[in-house]
């Protein structure tokens, strides 16, 4: 004979029983170990060791920084829209360019006393860095999405064409002064001035709101114009 079906009372009691009621009787042994080791693949470990600079030699660190500066120089000499100069910013290159330009614009102490119109080292240094800071603050006030040091990096590296112009002018002045010499120096300075402006705007223009790009580029134009004027009016 088939088993009798459960009474409605028994079914109701079974359905009202909690789902996890039996888990209260389950106990976990205290002897189960909960220790373990986390293994790192050898390839990942090697990459971390390569990326770490704590154990590298001073010579290797200097060479790595010089190579990075050289790559940024190439970005300025061949300006194109790229985020490399903004992403991997540094101030070593701008410092080197600023010091070298100030040294080339400085006369000897005897000539400086005789001709008071020549800019001194400190004057050139202050003009370049004060101008770069002013342009950076103007960019931030206009709503630019570039950091303070990124802007200083771009403006400093883009002085490179003017450094080349100053070097060429110094070499031309060794042949003496004259109208032809001045016209050649004027042409060189104008070309390098345009190069600096184009290179800097290629990196900074996209960091400004579309309706305020002209307001952000105008101070850059004035900044490099002042530096170019100091180069053009320099006489040994």
Swiss-Prot record:
<feature type="topological domain" description="Cytoplasmic">
    <location>
        <begin position="138"/>
        <end position="147"/>
    </location>
</feature>
<dbReference type="InterPro" id="IPR045231">
    <property type="entry name" value="Yip1/4-like"/>
</dbReference>
<dbReference type="InterPro" id="IPR006977">
    <property type="entry name" value="Yip1_dom"/>
</dbReference>
<dbReference type="GO" id="GO:0005801">
    <property type="term" value="C:cis-Golgi network"/>
</dbReference>
<keyword id="KW-0597">Phosphoprotein</keyword>
<keyword id="KW-0472">Membrane</keyword>
<feature type="transmembrane region" description="Helical">
    <location>
        <begin position="214"/>
        <end position="234"/>
    </location>
</feature>
<comment type="function">
    <text>May be required for stable YIPF1 and YIPF2 protein expression.</text>
</comment>
<feature type="topological domain" description="Lumenal">
    <location>
        <begin position="235"/>
        <end position="236"/>
    </location>
</feature>
<keyword id="KW-1133">Transmembrane helix</keyword>
<protein>
    <recommendedName>
        <fullName>Protein YIPF6</fullName>
    </recommendedName>
</protein>
<dbReference type="GO" id="GO:0006888">
    <property type="term" value="P:endoplasmic reticulum to Golgi vesicle-mediated transport"/>
</dbReference>
<feature type="transmembrane region" description="Helical">
    <location>
        <begin position="85"/>
        <end position="105"/>
    </location>
</feature>
<feature type="topological domain" description="Cytoplasmic">
    <location>
        <begin position="2"/>
        <end position="84"/>
    </location>
</feature>
<comment type="subunit">
    <text>Predominantly interacts with YIPF1 or YIPF2, but may also form a ternary complex with YIPF1 and YIPF2. This interaction may stabilize YIPF1 and YIPF2.</text>
</comment>
<dbReference type="GO" id="GO:0005797">
    <property type="term" value="C:Golgi medial cisterna"/>
</dbReference>
<dbReference type="GO" id="GO:0042802">
    <property type="term" value="F:identical protein binding"/>
</dbReference>
<feature type="transmembrane region" description="Helical">
    <location>
        <begin position="148"/>
        <end position="168"/>
    </location>
</feature>
<keyword id="KW-0812">Transmembrane</keyword>
<dbReference type="GO" id="GO:0030134">
    <property type="term" value="C:COPII-coated ER to Golgi transport vesicle"/>
</dbReference>
<keyword id="KW-0333">Golgi apparatus</keyword>
<dbReference type="GO" id="GO:0000138">
    <property type="term" value="C:Golgi trans cisterna"/>
</dbReference>
<comment type="similarity">
    <text>Belongs to the YIP1 family.</text>
</comment>
<feature type="modified residue" description="N-acetylalanine">
    <location>
        <position position="2"/>
    </location>
</feature>
<dbReference type="GO" id="GO:0005783">
    <property type="term" value="C:endoplasmic reticulum"/>
</dbReference>
<feature type="topological domain" description="Lumenal">
    <location>
        <begin position="106"/>
        <end position="116"/>
    </location>
</feature>
<dbReference type="GO" id="GO:0000139">
    <property type="term" value="C:Golgi membrane"/>
</dbReference>
<dbReference type="Pfam" id="PF04893">
    <property type="entry name" value="Yip1"/>
</dbReference>
<dbReference type="GO" id="GO:0060576">
    <property type="term" value="P:intestinal epithelial cell development"/>
</dbReference>
<feature type="transmembrane region" description="Helical">
    <location>
        <begin position="186"/>
        <end position="206"/>
    </location>
</feature>
<feature type="topological domain" description="Lumenal">
    <location>
        <begin position="169"/>
        <end position="185"/>
    </location>
</feature>
<feature type="topological domain" description="Cytoplasmic">
    <location>
        <begin position="207"/>
        <end position="213"/>
    </location>
</feature>
<keyword id="KW-0007">Acetylation</keyword>
<feature type="transmembrane region" description="Helical">
    <location>
        <begin position="117"/>
        <end position="137"/>
    </location>
</feature>
<dbReference type="GO" id="GO:0005802">
    <property type="term" value="C:trans-Golgi network"/>
</dbReference>
<feature type="modified residue" description="Phosphoserine">
    <location>
        <position position="7"/>
    </location>
</feature>
């Amino acid at each position: 004979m088939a088993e009798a079906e459960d009474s409605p009372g028994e079914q109701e009691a079974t359905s009202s029983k909690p789902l996890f009621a039996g888990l209260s009787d389950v106990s976990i042994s205290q002897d189960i170990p909960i220790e373990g080791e986390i293994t790192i693949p050898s390839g990942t470990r090697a990459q971390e060791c390569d990326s770490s600079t704590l154990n590298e030699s001073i010579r290797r660190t200097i060479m790595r920084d010089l190579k990075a500066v050289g790559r940024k120089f190439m970005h300025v000499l061949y300006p194109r829209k790229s985020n490399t100069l903004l992403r991997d910013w540094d101030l070593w290159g701008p410092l080197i360019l600023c010091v070298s330009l100030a040294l080339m614009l400085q006369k000897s102490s005897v000539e400086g006393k005789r001709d008071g119109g020549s800019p001194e080292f400190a004057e050139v240094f202050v003009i370049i860095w004060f101008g770069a800071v002013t342009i950076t603050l103007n960019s931030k006030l206009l709503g630019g999405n570039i950091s303070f040091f990124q802007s200083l990096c771009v403006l400093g590296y883009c002085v490179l064409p003017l450094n080349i112009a100053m070097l060429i002018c110094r070499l031309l002045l060794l042949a003496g002064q004259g109208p032809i010499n001045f016209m050649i120096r004027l042409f060189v300075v104008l070309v390098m001035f345009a190069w600096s402006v184009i290179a800097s705007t290629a990196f900074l223009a996209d960091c400004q709101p579309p309706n305020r790009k002209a307001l952000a580029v105008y101070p850059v134009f004035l900044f490099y114009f002042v530096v170019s004027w100091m180069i053009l009016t320099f006489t040994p």
